[in-house]
């Protein structure tokens, strides 16, 4: 697995981008996102009702992307020690569960994909491949853990079946309009199977809901940077929403695509 870690000026720029979007995400969450989306639509105009989500896309998310690990290195690149939960607003019950985490038992059980569920997948170092499944559905694959997420636009409704590791995701465009520079994709995910926010057993429950914002930032060299703001809400194991960002650099081809199975540790 290859990861990209910027240095010098690029490191500083990317870190500032990350900080900016954490703040922005918090503002969005507090404002219930609707008012901001309305304001953005006023600038860029809403897409025509006759357009499909694919045709109306205000930003280009398709292609191959590699994660850039500029923060939380010790949680994302190595398996953190039991008890190292810094930054996660855990409830006492969540801490009790995490303190009992045993990687050997996880491996023995065969249930080793708990840290590859939707709330944690974009924190796993690796690559993403994003394509349009059809005019209404965006497909995201990860080589790490061989996971697939489906983002459904329009009035799609989940099947109401069993909870799954990637859940049911409903997507919508916010702001902009095709050709705009300030659009975003908002994804709301529910019906999740319980899993881990981090490799060392930090839990999230099946009551978890996930809100994500996908945006594209143009870097000084003209290359695109995908910034994903991830807001995890879990009334069972989190005292407040857990807000993080992940960044991805676009790659020209699938030359470095390397599917690997889930693992309980790194």
Mark where each language-model region is:
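Repetitive helical segments and hydrophobic/amphipathic motifs
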Residues: 28-29
